[in-house]
Amino acid sequence: IEPDAEAYETVLAEQKEAQRFQELPQDSYLLPGFVDLHVHAPQWAQSGTALDIPLYEWLNTYTFPLESKFADLTFAQQVYDELVTQLLANGTTTALYFATIHYEASRRLAEICAEKGQRGLIGKVVMDDLNENPEYYRDQTTQQALEETERFIQEIQTLAQQTKQGVYPVVTPRFIPSCTEEALKGLGELAAKYQVHVQSHCSESDWEHQFVQERFGKNDAQALNDFGLLTEKAVMAHAGFLEEADMNLFHETGTAVAHCPISNAYFGNAVTPIAKLVHQHQVEVGLGSDLSGGFSPSLFDNLKQAVISSRMLEDGVDATKKPEVRGVKTARITVNEAFYLATVGGGQALSLPIGKLEKGYAWDVQIINTSLSQARIPKNPGESLLDIFQKILYLARPENIREVWVQGEKVHDKNLMSATKGV
């Protein structure tokens, strides 16, 4: 209802009396909650670690040893509880998670999302290739991997029935290098049988892209599609080396891209051409933090990096080349477009009614206060609402996020925390 409507004052009084009206403090603004399309949940424990080494070395020296520890449910509980709390505090109301190969720990992540009020999409990871995975961290057999995936789907769908904001099981082959053909085929069949979401990595780096070409004689996207893993509910992370045919295939199958600009800068070997994917090929794209290949849990940080990376792609980075050949024309995106990816784009990628403050969409919001003494966003008299909006996108910190709501329920309250601490 609009303030100038005849019934406005009456409706307002009724809502206040029913305690369904909350008046925001001055200099507060509502933004949709963020949708993070790519989070390696166990890797929260190593965020900010060894980002200066190649991907293959990073996985085998740091990541796989860490993820193997999630056989310990106590350790998993500690890490996952802290992660979900941190993501909510950073305005992330929906997250698409890679867990680990461990059934119990993966289920516990889903339960924590349900308990804390975050909309979580959780995948128990499959890594069954005996030759490509370390002996200490892999599925013992392909049959076991597929059976546990099916049981996980069934259990999380049952949990979802009693979870207001929703939790969702996700078919999750880690990436083609870690899986046998039998597993990839079986996972595609499970995705079709249960009509659930799918996630994996696709053409992430020179190493991964070339690995798939050598193994199958085709690009990652084409191989994944052959196994039934590109669908309307599929989200593929990175996609930095997609060719024209791959982009067309993503559009035709409805497959979305999780753009992870911070982690791509460390491990991606290239800048993903987001403007081309969205504007020329109509591929659905959202943002991902890619913890811990990306060091920050904040999509504010990632949307800024998305803009920076796109401008570097358009302008080029080799100063010895002439401007006309140095970069890629029309590759840049604006900060407004990056915000769209972090909200609406993520909702579209997941085929869920989230990411907008509109009728028919879930009430997922973050309340931003710009006038806090410890995190003040500067003002300029007479500036437009658009100017303030862009300042928030560039300058907001977790301290500015005072409240977070998911599906109409308050799940994070910085004001209450500050009052409790006497701040």
What are these model-derived regions, one by one?
Residues 1-31:
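Histidine-rich, glycine-flanked metal-binding segment
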Residues 32-44, 197-206:
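Histidine-centered catalytic micro-motifs
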Residues 45-76, 129-142, 206-231, 253-256, ...:
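Active-site gating loops and adjacent loop-to-helix segments of metal-dependent hydrolytic enzymes
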Residues 362-421:
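C-terminal cap of metal-dependent C-N hydrolases
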